[in-house]
Amino acid sequence: MSSTATTKGGRGKPKASKSVSRSSKAGLQFPVGRIARFLKAGKYAERVGAGAPVYLSAVLEYLAAEVLELAGNAARDNKNNRIVPRHIQLAVRNDEELSKLLGSVTIANGGVLPNIHQTLLPKKVGKGKGEIGSASQEF
């Protein structure tokens, strides 16, 4: 028998193995090949290393997962099953690091964070025992 057992009768080319994407090799969901193409076409540098698009894909995937998790929590808090831009806005602005990263970003249809300044809130009227003998304004 010949060493090429994959071909019929030793004739023809051996079967080519199935191609594996760089995203699946790196265990990522974001497209490494597309990001590599964008890096090359964007003229950020004359040459782009082999690891750069993989690393950038991993960073983008992590950031997207972080925002989606927080936005999903915000949607669940509002008793919604669907994430809308308002939930993304609430998620980003309530997280200190993401708010700093996306500080100059405007999210369309995101609205604003609910905030009432402390001086505008009504004064608390206490009905406790300590206020009976209070002499703060007496002379």
UniProtKB/Swiss-Prot annotation:
UniProt comment concerning the protein's domains = The [ST]-Q motif constitutes a recognition sequence for kinases from the PI3/PI4-kinase family.
Q: What is its main location?
A: nucleus
Q: What is this protein called?
A: Histone H2AX
Q: Describe the subunit structure.
A: The nucleosome is a histone octamer containing two molecules each of H2A, H2B, H3 and H4 assembled in one H3-H4 heterotetramer and two H2A-H2B heterodimers. The octamer wraps approximately 147 bp of DNA. Interacts with numerous proteins required for DNA damage signaling and repair when phosphorylated on Ser-136.
PROSITE patterns in the record: HISTONE_H2A
Recorded GO cellular component terms are: nucleosome; nucleus
Q: Name one Pfam family in it.
A: Histone
The sequence motif named [ST]-Q motif is recorded at: 136-137
Q: Which CDD domains match?
A: HFD_H2A
Question: Coding gene?
Answer: HIS2A
Q: Which GO terms describe its molecular function?
A: DNA binding; protein heterodimerization activity; structural constituent of chromatin
Q: Residues annotated as region Disordered? A: 1-24
Specify the superkingdom.
Eukaryota
Q: Which PANTHER family match?
A: HISTONE H2A
Report the source organism.
Cicer arietinum (Chickpea)
Q: What post-translational events are described?
A: Phosphorylated on Ser-136 (to form gamma-H2AX) in response to DNA double strand breaks (DSBs) generated by exogenous genotoxic agents and by stalled replication forks, and may also occur during meiotic recombination events. Phosphorylation can extend up to several thousand nucleosomes from the actual site of the DSB and may mark the surrounding chromatin for recruitment of proteins required for DNA damage signaling and repair. Widespread phosphorylation may also serve to amplify the damage signal or aid repair of persistent lesions.
